[in-house]
Amino acid sequence: MEEVGDLIGRGFRVWRNNLNLCLPFLFSFALSIIALLPILAAFFYTFGPMENLDSITSEDMLAKIEGSALVWAAAFLLSALLLTGVSAFFTAAAIGMAGRALETGIASTGDMWAAGKKHFLNMFLASILTGFMVIAGMVFLLPGIALLPQPFQPEPQAMGLLITGVVLFMLYALSMSLLLAVVPYALVTDDLGPVKAVWSSVGFFRYNKFDVLVLWLAVVAISLGLQMIGGAVSAGENVSFQPLSAVTGLVNVLVLSPLTTVWWTRLYMSRTGKLLDSGVKNPW
C-alpha cells in the first residue's frame, strides 16, 4: 500500500507537470467576487452614493438596514447560492482534472469543463447537505444561549453552558471535517449522488482513519503556516512588505489549492484501487 509520504511526493510531481491545475481555482476566485455583487447592490440601495456615508450616524445606519431587511436577506441568500454554485462547479472541475492527471499524467482544460458540467448539480447539493450537517452542531450552543439573561449580562451558569457548547461544537465540527473529508472526491471519482458520496466518505474514513488524519493535519498545517506568514507580513509597519501578503494569497490559489486537491484525489483513488500504479485493490 502506498504510504502517505510517497503519496505526497508523487502528488507533487503530478502537480508540477500539470500547472494548469490552478485554473479552476483562478476562475472560482474571480467569479466568487462577482457573486458578491448582490450584497454590493443592497449596500447602494440602502445607503446611496458613497459620499453620503460621512453624514450618516451609526443609529441612522442601523435604521436604514432594518428598513431594508428583506433586500439584505435576499442579497445574502442570492450571494450564498451563487458562491456555493461557483464553488461546486470548480471543485468538481479541479477534482476531475486531478483524476485525469493521476491516470494519464496530463490534464487539459477540456477535462475541467467536462467534469464541472457533469458533476455540478450533485456537488452543489452535496455542498448544501454537508453544510447543514455541520451547522446542525450548533444545537450544542442552544442551552447556554437560552439561559443568557436579557439584556445580556454575564451569568456564571449560562456562560459555563455556553463555553461547554462551544467546545462540543468545535469537536463536532472537527469530527465532521474528518468524516466528510473525501465527499467531493468520492462524488466525482465514483460518479455518486450527494447522499451516497457522504456514506462513501464515512466508509472510507472507517478503513483509512490514519491516512485521512495525517493528510488532513498536513494540509491544515501548511494552510495555517501560509496564513501566519501573510498575517505577520500584513501586520508589519514597513509598507514595502505589504505586497507580500498578496503573494501568500496567490500561493494559496496557484499552488496550495491544486496541490492539496491532487493529494486528496490520489489518496481516494489509491485506497480504492483506481490507480494502476498503486497496487491496491478495493478494500470493500
Where do the model's predicted regions map?
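Alpha-helical membrane-spanning segments of integral membrane proteins, especially the hydrophobic core
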Residues: 72, 76, 107-135, 157-170
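Membrane-interfacial helix-loop-helix connectors in multipass membrane proteins
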Residues: 144-167, 232-247
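Alpha-helical transmembrane segments
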Residues: 72-87, 161-175, 249, 253
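Juxtamembrane transition segments at transmembrane-helix termini in multipass membrane proteins
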Residues: 6-8, 26-27, 31-32, 43-70, ...
